[in-house]
Curated annotation (Swiss-Prot):
This is UPF0122 protein stu0888. The lineage of its organism: Bacteria, Bacillati, Bacillota, Bacilli, Lactobacillales. InterPro entries: RNA_pol_sigma_r3/r4-like, UPF0122, UPF0122_fam_protein, WH-like_DNA-bd_sf. SUPFAM superfamilies: Sigma3 and sigma4 domains of RNA polymerase sigma factors. Might take part in the signal recognition particle (SRP) pathway. This is inferred from the conservation of its genetic proximity to ftsY/ffh. May be a regulatory protein. Belongs to the UPF0122 family.
Length: 110
């Protein structure tokens, strides 16, 4: 499995998991976060390996569709880069550093 794809799916899952069904959440989490094989997931849920594969592929598409429409992950990446740039450029400005920390904590809350 490609590391870049795994990282992206895990990130998209973090942003959009609440929009998925329980089965979609379980399969994606086991496959990408816990590194289960298709066979292990199939055995766990009493379904065929093909059923797991189909569900994961559909869910990947759903996650990508959510990102295309909502841009939550890509916006988070841009905000994080801007925060990092400000923190570096204005390292001596304690007020600005504090405000950036507050904004960052808003992005990172559950």
């Amino acid at each position: 499995m490609e590391i870049e794809k795994t990282n992206r799916m895990n990130a998209l899952f973090e942003f959009y998991a609440a929009l998925l069904t329980d089965k979609q959440m379980n399969y994606i989490e086991l496959y990408y976060a816990d590194d289960y094989s298709l066979a292990e997931i199939a055995e766990e849920f009493g379904v065929s390996r093909q059923a797991v594969y189909d569900n994961i592929k559909r869910t990947e598409k759903i996650l990508e569709d959510y990102e295309m429409k909502l841009h939550m992950y890509s916006d988070y990446i841009v905000r994080s880069q801007i925060f990092d740039d400000i923190m570096e450029k204005y390292a001596d400005d304690s007020y600005l550093q504090e405000q950036i920390a507050i904004l960052s904590s808003i992005d990172n809350r559950d």
